[in-house]
Every structure is written in structure tokens, then in C-alpha cells.
Amino acid sequence: MTKKISGINTGAIKFNDKFCLMAVKIKDEDSTCHTYYMQLSVMLDFIILMRDRAHKAVKKLQENGEIYKAKIIAEHEKLAMNIPAFEEEELQQPNQANLIISITPKFADEHCTLIVVLQNEHILSLTIPDIQAEFFILAVQQALNATNDTETLKQIASILDFLMLYFVDLSDLSYLNYKEINHEPWKQSLFAQHLAVLYSFEKEEGEEILAGAVIKTNAPPDTEEAKNLIKRIALIAPGLREIVEKRHLTQTFMKVIPADQTQVLTLDECMRPLYEFCLETQKTL
């Protein structure tokens, strides 16, 4: 049975003064309350999903004006009046059986149905209208801010607007050493563009492309937003960061890999255009 949410509360749980779990207490439409827990990886999936649904709500607001605005306000007021209170033990002694292992959305025009798998192997089905998404984002954000865990907050903020699909060592083009980062197809479908990205570094004999990546993002290619994103990735992606710490990063390059937004590209469909882009670009350096 699919449940509808009439109220939500969030509380961040810390361990050794660092963020550990996000407690989420949900009130159903029949006023029954349940508390679940999200680790960082699942919480990131939830935030990315809610950001996408909130963006769709903004689009509908632009199309439908005051009527849709009133609908959003009414929904947020209802949620605000039905915030369930935590019991002290729910935050101090989390029930591991209610740890969320994964979330998988099924998309509809104005809502998504969230299939939630728990540690105890129970499966929940939650309907989340798009007009609730912004409220849920704010609830999670407020709980995170209360932790004062600046390191985790910076980490979260730096990885919400892209997905790293592949990191590639391009120092030896005769053998592409790569690392694949797997993401569920639903998550990939939330990002519009596949980009091949190259990083060139200063060497004694001149400039050379030493690393690359294939990412998905909603940042329009060749914009300041995309350029800043690519530079940020160089500072946070482990393989890239190691090179940046040893060598001076001179230039970054990007190129769209043509594909439908919902298409999940194969290894060859990612590596081949990245390799060809690298050969073309290296000639210009």
C-alpha cells in the first residue's frame, strides 16, 4: 500500500562530532508516525531527487501562475502544521532495522512514488507530490546546518550538481586506465548532458593532457557554470586531486557526448568519444 505524507520532521545524528545519520520522522495521512534513517549516500540520492521534483514544480508555477502558487503554499502550510515530534530515544538510539538501504522513484507527471528498501528487508511505498519537494529539501537542510559539520556540508554542496561516471588516466593512451562509478538509471536520468572532460597539466617538456572524466550534469556546456564545475571536480575527485596536488593544472576542456537524457551509455560509448576528444585536443596544445 502506498502511503501519503502529511507531515515530516528531520534530525541529524552525529558520531564523534561528525554527521552520521539523518533521522526522518513521517506522519501518514492517518496520523500514524514512523521514523527512518538515511546514511549520507542515500540522503544525497534523496536530495538530488527532491531538487529535480522541486524544479519541475517551479516550471509548473511559471506556467500556471497564482493557482499553482496557492496550491504550493497550502501544501507547505499543511506540512508545517503536522510536523511530528521526535522521541529522545529515536535520535539517541536509532533502530538499525529502519535504516534505509535504497530508494527508487517511479515518476509521474506531478509526483513520484518512492520505493524504499529498509535494513530489515521491508519495502515501503511513499507518494511524494512535487509541491512537497521544496519543503522536504528545507527540512533536510535545516537539520544538516544544525550539525555545524562544515566539512560534510561542503562535501554535500560540491557533489549535488553532477554525476561522475568515469575517471580516466590519460597519461598513457595505449592503455586507458579508468575507474567506473555506478549510478542507478533513474539517477542518471535526472541529469541532461553527458560531457567528456579533459584536464591538461604543465610538464617540463610542455603541456599535456593527463586525465579525463565522463560526467552527467544539467549545467549548459561551455558556460561559466560548467567551467567552474569542471574545475571543482579536479579538486574533489580522488584521482584528479592527486595529480593537481603534484602538477599545475593549466587548462580544462569539455565536449558534449550526444545521447538522450534517459540513455545509459555503455563503457565504449563513453571511452571512445573521450579518447578521440583527447587526441584532437592534444594536437592543439
Residue ranges and their predicted role:
Residues 1-285:
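Positively charged, low-complexity terminal tracts
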